[in-house]
Amino acid sequence: MSVGGEFKAMRKPIHWNHPVWVILVLHVSLLVLIASRTTPNVDEVAHLPAGISYWKFGDFQLYSVNPPLVRFVAAAPVLVAEPEFDWEATISGPESRPEWEVAQRYIAATGSRSLWYFRFARWACLVFPAIGGFFSWK
């Protein structure tokens, strides 16, 4: 038997009527509902402008205390909406933490639209629990 045949025999087919799929869809649906109806928490306010700055400038100084992957994913759909924001004087030194000042200015600049931007960012991050749930099942 060839190596390809052995690999093919080891793969499990995906059954869409499996109860795990129902649980995953329900889980993601509830997360969409929660992401749509709750306000941003303390950290999210700074995460989103930091993620936008990563995409726009390739600069990782804002919120540089955690890995940037989630901020990258969250900021991607917000960049499509092209929020207007002045980025002047956001970084002041290697030991500074300007993300909180930037977050306040970002919310002031985007106004009531900022809640929609946070929703878009949260919806983009739903890929993480969906993938995690899928691979936990596998």
Language-model features, listed with the residues they occupy:
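Interfacial juxtamembrane loops and adjacent helix segments
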Residues: 61-124
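Extracytoplasmic catalytic/substrate-binding loops of multi-pass membrane glycan-assembly enzymes
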Residues: 37-49, 60-73
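Short, Lys/Arg-rich, polar N-terminal cytosolic tail immediately upstream
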Residues: 1-13
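Transmembrane signal-anchor helices characteristic of membrane glycosylation enzymes that use polyprenol
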Residues: 16-44, 56-59
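Membrane-water interface of alpha-helical transmembrane segments
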Residues: 10-20, 115-125
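Transmembrane-helix motifs of polytopic, lipid-linked glycan transferases
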Residues: 123-138
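Membrane-interacting alpha-helical segments
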Residues: 4, 52-55, 74-77, 81
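Extracytoplasmic catalytic-loop and juxtamembrane helix elements of membrane-embedded
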Residues: 42-53, 88-98
